[in-house]
Amino acid sequence: MFIIKKKYYLYIENTSDINLKCIKKSKKIFIIYRNKSIKENIDKLYKFRKLCAERGFKFYIANDLRLLKACKGDGLYLSSFNKKISLDKRINLIGSAHCFKEINEKIKQGCKTILLSRLFKTDYANKKDFFGLIKFNLIIKNYKISIIPLGGIRASNLNKLNLVNSSGLALLSETKKKPAIASRLF
């Protein structure tokens, strides 16, 4: 399990989901905080953001501009359902997409990077479709923007990521299920 990429995106839903001290200092790591259920204390988030800055990690907040400004995050993550067009051009934006239409929407929104979802098959009951390596590589040839694979990435198929023509990778459920994977990857 040795993957060489320029950028690694890790999704967390709580600041306790990941132990930053287990991961080497690196400017390659982007942490995306997307808490849908409970509101976390802003002071706690600010301290977490400072710890990220000390370790050289970029800290992005999902879909919440006020929270981004309150904890002084590095940028904003726009989910695929977020259709707002008018955003501040000075904010670093990362978008999420599942199809061509959503990729084009994220480009119009000004996203510098797009996380394209479901590279591999997932266990979700209502989400059966996925791109696969060949289709994903064909899709990213059509765009000049940085497109990163997300979805279905597990410890068992990490080596296949070396075949993806992308500058990075994104992990969501694998960091929750197996937190030690983050320290092994980097």
Stretches with model-predicted labels:
Residues 6-12, 29-33, 59-61, 76-78, ...:
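Hydrophobic faces of well-ordered beta-strands that scaffold small-molecule active sites
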Residues 11-24, 63-66, 99-105, 154-159:
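Short, acidic/polar
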Residues 25-26, 71, 109, 142, ...:
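Structural motif
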Residues 27-89:
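N-terminal active-site wall of soluble small-molecule enzyme domains
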Residues 31, 68, 106, 114, ...:
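Conserved, mostly hydrophobic/aromatic
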Residues 44-60, 83, 88-100, 128-152, ...:
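Alpha-helix-loop-beta-strand connector modules within alpha/beta enzyme cores
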Residues 76-87, 115-130, 152-186:
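Glycine-rich phosphate-binding active-site loops on the catalytic face of alpha/beta enzymes
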Residues 93-122:
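Histidine/lysine/aspartate-rich catalytic loop segments that bind and position anionic ligands
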